[in-house]
């Protein structure tokens, strides 16, 4: 089957197998920030934006993305780098394997709710597994990022 989608701002048309996961499609196109973790939608490593909403690309068929926009961390370089610096500053990146999925979900949270409470942050990121147990540092990094963004916008 043939699909056409916009990946990180670039329109792509490809012939794909009907059972191809979106995860495999984006990785085949060089988007290696999207990780294969559990293949069961339990770890958050494969998070991408489908029309600006976070989805787990291991459980989404590429056919579902036909005609839509898909964004990976490669398409959010400036924003992801800004946010990633706050995670690193808190020592929460350790091995870094979980960072892309966690960053994608944290950015989605910030876009949906620019002033989340600590409980809202924890709830939103509950599906992101970190094998190094950096959760507290990640939480502090997110809170610091939000405070910085508000200051950038002149709200503090």
Describe these PLM feature segments.
Residues 1-156:
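Signature of N-terminal electron-transfer/Fe-S-associated modules in redox systems
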């Amino acid at each position: 089957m043939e699909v056409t989608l916009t990946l990180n701002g670039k329109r792509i048309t490809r012939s794909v197998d009907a059972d191809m996961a979106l995860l495999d499609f984006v990785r085949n196109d060089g988007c290696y920030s999207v990780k294969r973790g559990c293949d069961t939608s339990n770890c958050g490593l494969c998070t991408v934006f489908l029309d600006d909403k976070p989805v787990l690309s291991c459980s989404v068929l590429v056919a579902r993305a036909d005609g839509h926009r898909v964004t990976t961390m490669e398409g959010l370089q400036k924003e992801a780098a800004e946010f990633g610096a706050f995670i690193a500053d808190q020592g929460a990146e350790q091995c870094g394997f979980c960072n892309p999925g966690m960053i994608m979900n944290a950015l989605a949270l910030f876009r949906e709710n620019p002033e989340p409470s600590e409980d809202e942050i924890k709830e939103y990121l509950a599906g992101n597994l970190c094998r190094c147990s950096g959760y507290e540092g990640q939480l502090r990094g997110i809170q610091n990022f939000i405070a910085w963004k508000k200051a950038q916008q002149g709200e503090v």
